[in-house]
Design a protein with these regions (language model features):
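N-terminal lobe of the biotin/lipoate ligase/transferase fold
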Residues: 1-102
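Catalytic beta-strand/loop module used to bind and position nucleotide/cofactor moieties
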Residues: 87-134
């Protein structure tokens, strides 16, 4: 792109496998140049539990129960807490250069998309959560 212009791309994963989606997310992070490129990855998963980089799965999840129910357990490379995913959960990853990262801007993109696409009114609170109903 010309000097100062930012290319924007959206990747929508066709996979619902947590390991494939985390691998794709990690590959993009490690191999793409975000100096003049903003990327959004959209993905969903079959039922799974995802733990943060430094978390102990035995403290964060009922591992025997996950095995009984055939629910995948995965570790992501980023920090953060343990979360449950299923096909009703939409995951969005924003990739941008560190100097251009703006959480509020990313949240506003999601807020606008909810309204434009579905007529859903939402707000962003002081904790930077998107609330549909508070």
């Amino acid at each position: 792109p010309p000097e100062g212009e930012i290319t924007k791309s959206v990747f929508m994963s066709q996979s619902t496998d947590i390991y494939t989606n985390l691998a794709m997310e990690d590959w993009m992070y490690r191999n793409m140049d975000f100096s003049d490129h903003h990327v959004m990855m959209v993905w969903r998963n079959e039922p799974c539990v995802v733990i943060g980089r430094h978390q102990n799965p035995w403290l964060e999840a009922n591992v025997p129960f996950l095995g009984e129910k055939e629910i995948s357990l995965a570790r992501r490379n980023s920090g953060g807490g343990t979360v449950y995913h299923d096909r009703g959960n939409l995951n969005i990853t924003f990739f941008t250069h560190r100097d251009r990262y703006d959480r509020k801007y990313n949240l506003e993109l999601i807020k606008r998309a909810l309204y434009r696409g579905f007529g859903i009114k939402s707000l962003i609170n002081e904790r930077q959560d998107i609330l549909v109903r508070d």
